[in-house]
């Protein structure tokens, strides 16, 4: 039962997230020979105020 977690910054549309879940499921199913119904995709959308790189929040760039 594969679990795939994807973290990304806010701003993607619902259609983009829907397509991402579908396409990731396809790739994992193909490569691991796992049934699609057993693949879990977890999307973790982060606010730009809650993520930083090099000491600077993304919201401050």
UniProtKB/Swiss-Prot annotation:
Pfam families: Tautomerase. The keyword Isomerase applies. GO terms for molecular function: isomerase activity. Keywords: Isomerase. Gene3D superfamilies: Macrophage Migration Inhibitory Factor. InterPro entries: 4-OT (IPR018191), 4-OT-like_dom (IPR004370), Tautomerase/MIF_sf (IPR014347). The active site is at 2 (proton acceptor). Its EC number is 5.3.2.-. It is an enzyme of class 5 (isomerase). It comes from the Bacteria. The keyword Isomerase applies. Belongs to the 4-oxalocrotonate tautomerase family. This is Probable tautomerase lmo2564.
């Amino acid at each position: 039962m594969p679990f795939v977690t994807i973290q990304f910054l806010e701003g993607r549309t619902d259609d983009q997230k829907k397509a991402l879940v579908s396409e990731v499921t396809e790739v994992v199913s193909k490569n691991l020979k796992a049934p699609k119904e057993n693949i879990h995709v977890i999307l973790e959308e982060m606010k730009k105020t809650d993520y930083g790189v090099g000491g600077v929040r993304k919201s401050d760039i």
